[in-house]
């Protein structure tokens, strides 16, 4: 990969986008951005607080604005929020401005990775099981992830290092 193209990681919460993104950026000597962290940095509050005060719609507006700004940069790795692909505008921009990598994971893996995390607003449910919420999100979002993915990586039990090097190999042939 001689020219440093933007790399955009998409997928559901708990897929490993932030972790893989940081390691991938480090290996490729690229700048790393996490859209949720950028929102928190710019607002001074965490994502859960924004959801509580502004609702999901308010959060999505902020997310769309920040992602639109970040993807104008060159030679970056961006880990997007799981719901960012709900915006047609964001899907179009991601597709046209870099390589989109979908980190596909099962609901079972998501449950393991998210069960102790109280910072995920969509999982703060009263009368619904977290598994049901994740299954519903997957039903609606997985087709959107698939529709814009240039590369799909099935997240399994491989190490972070193995996944990162696999992605780099795929990018070199892309």
Curated annotation (Swiss-Prot):
Sample GO molecular function, one term: ATP binding
InterPro entries in the record: P-loop_NTPase, Shikimate/glucono_kinase, Shikimate_kinase/TSH1, Shikimate_kinase_CS
CDD domains referenced in this protein's UniProt entry, alphabetically: SK
Binding positions for ATP per the UniProt entry: 14-19, 120, 158
GO annotations of cellular component type: cytosol
Domain of life per record: Bacteria
GO biological process, one term: aromatic amino acid family biosynthetic process
Enzyme class at the top of the EC tree: transferase
Keywords: Amino-acid biosynthesis, Aromatic amino acid biosynthesis, ATP-binding, Cytoplasm, Kinase, Magnesium, Metal-binding, Nucleotide-binding, Transferase
Cofactor note: Binds 1 Mg(2+) ion per subunit.
A Pfam entry, by short name: SKI
Residues where substrate binds: 36, 60, 82, 141
Subcellular location per the Swiss-Prot or TrEMBL entry: Cytoplasm
Catalyzed reactions per annotation: shikimate + ATP = 3-phosphoshikimate + ADP + H(+)
Cofactor(s) annotated in UniProt: Mg(2+)
Biological or metabolic pathway of the protein: Metabolic intermediate biosynthesis; chorismate biosynthesis; chorismate from D-erythrose 4-phosphate and phosphoenolpyruvate: step 5/7
Residues annotated to bind Mg(2+): 18
EC number: 2.7.1.71
Role of this protein: Catalyzes the specific phosphorylation of the 3-hydroxyl group of shikimic acid using ATP as a cosubstrate.
Subunit structure, as described in the record: Monomer.
Family statement: Belongs to the shikimate kinase family.
Identification of the protein by name: Shikimate kinase
Lineage of the species this protein comes from: Bacteria, Pseudomonadati, Pseudomonadota, Gammaproteobacteria, Enterobacterales
